[in-house]
């Protein structure tokens, strides 16, 4: 070879590129060795020797750094794919923990998105739409890349299995039938209306018939059995004012017609409900 030709023939790895000063047979198959043809760290851009004969012994081994598109065919095992930043990081069948090594990201398939005891709730990752398949999804095959899992904790109370509603961030987070305690949770937001729709009663415990939807829903309260303050969120205004906050009209009448029982005390008045008259006449 000419002296100006770049070559991988080098007995020392001191420089990234060496000027060819060794015999032409150095990079031929019969003398190829680590001391003669070293893919890394002497060379970081190529995996094969600069020679007319492509020597298989100069291919890179299956390591994280030299595993490029030009030398993955000789890697062992065969599932050493590109990094997890690439869509085709791992295939479904040969994907193992010691086989797919990420370069700049976490691997796409390693841990399940759901809990161990809820195999049916393994949903897709919020970052990778096709992370998990519905049929072949296993404990070592699903994980979100940059977000939290879609399903872990229920939005509703433990004793109300039928109230598991959708999350305000992920509308299709929970389905109505397989929704369990370890399968529903809002990811980045609160539920649709401040609190779960059918978990916390808007009314008092003594009046079960008035326990309607959340105070964000139109059919929240009925005038006969609604209670204020502690059961109503400050972020959601009730559609109807609690009955105990609305004194009767005679309360603001002259003192002669005012009864002591017509105006509730201050403790019954919430921040969102004010009496019809500013001060009881009686």
Curated annotation (Swiss-Prot):
Keyword annotations of the record = Keratin, Repeat
Q: Which GO terms describe its cellular component?
A: cytosol; keratin filament
Transmembrane annotation, as ranges: none
* Leader sequence residues: none
Pfam families, alphabetized: Keratin_B2_2 (PF13885)
Region feature 24 X 5 AA repeats of C-C-X(3), mapped onto this chain: 26-266
Q: In which tissues is it expressed?
A: Restricted to a narrow region of the hair fiber cuticle, lying approximately 20 cell layers above the apex of the dermal papilla of the hair root; not detected in any other tissues.
Q: Where are the sequence repeats?
A: 26-30, 31-35, 36-40, 57-61, 79-83, 89-93, 99-103, 104-108, 109-113, 121-125, 131-135, 141-145, 146-150, 163-167, 173-177, 183-187, 193-197, 198-202, 210-214, 220-224, 225-229, 244-248, 251-255, 262-266
What does the annotation say about its assembly with partners? Interacts with hair keratins.
Function according to Swiss-Prot or TrEMBL: In the hair cortex, hair keratin intermediate filaments are embedded in an interfilamentous matrix, consisting of hair keratin-associated proteins (KRTAP), which are essential for the formation of a rigid and resistant hair shaft through their extensive disulfide bond cross-linking with abundant cysteine residues of hair keratins. The matrix proteins include the high-sulfur and high-glycine-tyrosine keratins.
* Protein family per UniProt: Belongs to the KRTAP type 10 family.
Identify this protein by name: Keratin-associated protein 10-1
Source species: Homo sapiens (Human)
Q: What is the lineage of its organism?
A: Eukaryota, Metazoa, Chordata, Craniata, Vertebrata
